[in-house]
Amino acid sequence: MPYKAIKEIGEFRLIGKISEIAEPTLEAVPDLINGIGDDCAVYKVSDTLLQVATTDILVDQIHFDLLTTPIKHLGSKAISVNVSDICAMNALPRYALISLAIPPSFTVEMIEELYRGMQHAALHYGIAIAGGDTSSSRSGLVISVSMVGEVHPDRVTLRKGAEPGDLVCVTGALGGAAAGLRLLMREKEIMLEHIENNEPYNRNVMADLQEYREAIKRQLLPLARLETVRFLEAQGVRPSAMIDISDGLSSDLQHICSQSGTGALIHENRIPIHAETRLIADELQQDALTWALTGGEDYELLFTIPKNCSGLIEHSRDISIIGEITEAEAGISITDIYGMTIDLTAIKGFDHFQT
Amino acid sequence: MPYKAIKEIGEFRLIGKISEIAEPTLEAVPDLINGIGDDCAVYKVSDTLLQVATTDILVDQIHFDLLTTPIKHLGSKAISVNVSDICAMNALPRYALISLAIPPSFTVEMIEELYRGMQHAALHYGIAIAGGDTSSSRSGLVISVSMVGEVHPDRVTLRKGAEPGDLVCVTGALGGAAAGLRLLMREKEIMLEHIENNEPYNRNVMADLQEYREAIKRQLLPLARLETVRFLEAQGVRPSAMIDISDGLSSDLQHICSQSGTGALIHENRIPIHAETRLIADELQQDALTWALTGGEDYELLFTIPKNCSGLIEHSRDISIIGEITEAEAGISITDIYGMTIDLTAIKGFDHFQT
């Protein structure tokens, strides 16, 4: 019997197989509006209220490294990445459940610090930490957060729904989280080298990361774009499709297009990249645009709106219009600063099983 | 600065510390009725509907051993233990979210098999597998399931609510899951010995476990007591307090008493123990009562009802009345078959951090 390694098929085809197996279970619950394949599941609670639900698992050495991550920040990030998924449905977060698998080396104080980070983020977003589960772990720390949010049926936004002619918008700036990660990894290597060579690692040899504060903060303490959800509601704009950028702009735009049955054309010179991100890319001899397209973990919102809504968002400093939705036949492309058009589907985002 | 190992304070005091940190976040969400400290969080959706939500994390080598656990059974069990938490609130399960951290050694076929077990259980309970998250893992498999259920405000049952004079009831039989686990562990040892000695391990040397089918099934494929929730509703009985037996009767009865501010007196000769469980205990020179009191993982329901409801449940073959709720001052005790009264608080259930 042939056995297939998961990395042979990758994360998204694995999710496809999982969806197929889960499919027959959906019939039991007629109020379910949307199952696997979006940022959240969506189900009807009443004629005026939908709930959305999401879960994210964070694994030591895969999603974080405690050598470079203050544990309180990690707690905050675990909340933020789930809030970001709720925001991607144009919904407001309400309740969080936290599951932990805790290695033997962890102390009570470390768990308290982790929860203080979660508490801080929960208070920021106005959500309740309402329950959870704790277990021991034979290996590293595992954090699984599940979150329930609410949205009016007229406001909910799925990945599908983009139409040719819609504008492609993105919040904030991209690539910063990837830049921050590269800096932290470099710093970790320097630290480990010093330890290996029995040399002191202290403030004298540590890089001054103060000037790269923003990028490191983007990596360690990302904030979900709850204010964008509120802004869009205040402006009376309902996006036709939305996703949060967790895998990278390229991959996440492809999710919108494949589920909407469309293509897209975006423009390099409109992609918001922070000056600091460009500086870090220069210093590390890397490409800031690649970080923006494939770095992931920016937790910005990528959404599409009908063209006639552009006036309603153009005064927002936080939203950039980076391109347009096209017919599927036109493909998914980016024009570079020289006017060349490049196929975006050749540029992949993060895949947990193919790294 | 003094650092405390988690095993010094144990699982329940750790949860206490977590609750304190989470407490301030509860104020943001006035619809939240019950936070950390019960089998589920409870929140109001409308005047006629509450939702309950729970999460359970299953970790390789802590909660399961793939040497003795068919992976499809594991999928089914991951669903059942969450349904059991929903049932403990007297609620009906609706939606499940599944998070997996998958080790590199896992194949696509193994994940499909895991999900087929989940699908099987989901169809059995009538719940939708509505979403999830997949990640790689540097070590063992981690499964985190979160589940949302529904209950009418007049039916919801918390751990608190037991009153002196109430009858203490339990469904099914206890200790079977512990008996099954001991058998599987013995079989694993025999297998590993054979492998170590380069001797074949095949059907000729494998123990015939057919006669212990029920106990092994209790361990590998427990079923949540959804039919008890339906039965109680049909009978018009609302338990005053309820919990599912995941840590063991002793520990879980103490949870009801501490949250209700009561004591309890139960009777050894009324505790339902399957004949097969007693046989296995004899064979392994262990004590079946200890398994029933502290073995855990039986996923039966432990609940209390007003004395005048006893007539409504006495025709159920699945429910045993094992004792009575008392004033707090009387403590929490068990009378043995010789009439001796023993303090139950000295008999501890499973603690993830003190094993």
Positions of PLM-derived features:
Chain A
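Small-aliphatic-rich amphipathic alpha-helix that forms the alpha element of a beta-alpha
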Residues: I71-Y95, R116-H124, F231, S251-I256
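A generic local secondary-structure boundary/capping motif
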Residues: P30-L32, C40-A41, Q119, G132-S136, ...
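Short helix-loop capping/hinge motifs at secondary-structure junctions, enriched
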Residues: L49, H152-T157, S310
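Polyanion-binding loop/helix "lid" in catalytic or ligand-binding cores
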Residues: P200-Q254
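Phosphate/diphosphate-binding glycine-rich loops and adjacent basic-rich segments that engage nucleotide
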Residues: P153-L220
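Glycine-/charge-enriched secondary-structure boundary and capping motifs
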Residues: P2-L26, T69, P103-A130, S135-I143, ...
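Extreme N-terminal cap/leader segments of soluble proteins
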Residues: M1-P70, M89, I98, T355
